[in-house]
Amino acid sequence: KKITLDFQETGKTVLTDEKWLLFVVEQVLSNALKYTPEGGTIRIYGDGATVVIADNGIGIREEDQARVFEKGYTGYNGRADKKSTGIGLYLCRQVMDRLNHGISLTSRPGQGTLVRLDLSREWRMVE
């Protein structure tokens, strides 16, 4: 698909459940890869307390954004060839809530989506 992945390491370490946080990151990246067109870009950056995954994919309509974390909600993804169960972001929200972290999403159709993982609700930086 020839997608550019731009990853900016912070060099910071946060104490959290690595397995479940990795699950969330993988799910969000999977969505970004699915909905980013050939030649697109996915950026991963943050400051240690926040991780941002942003793409320049097809985006999500404003009326669908409030519901993307609901179980089974798929919304209109604009592409019939992209099947979705509507369970991925729901599970991400459940995991982040259990870890006492936050997850939010902003998007513009035709411009892409930005998912913010807020680890600052309960976190400690490791020096």
Identify the residue ranges that each predicted region occupies.
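Conserved micro-motifs of the catalytic ATP-binding
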Residues: 9, 13-16
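Short helix-loop "hinge" at the ATP-lid/N-box region of the Bergerat-fold HATPase_c
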Residues: 32-33
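Short beta-strand/loop element within the Bergerat-fold HATPase_c
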Residues: 39-50
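Acidic ATP/Mg2+-coordinating residue in the GHKL
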Residues: 55
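Short conserved segment of the HATPase_c
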Residues: 60-73
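Glycine-rich ATP-lid/hinge loop adjacent to the conserved G-boxes
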Residues: 73-83
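Conserved glycine-rich
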Residues: 101-103
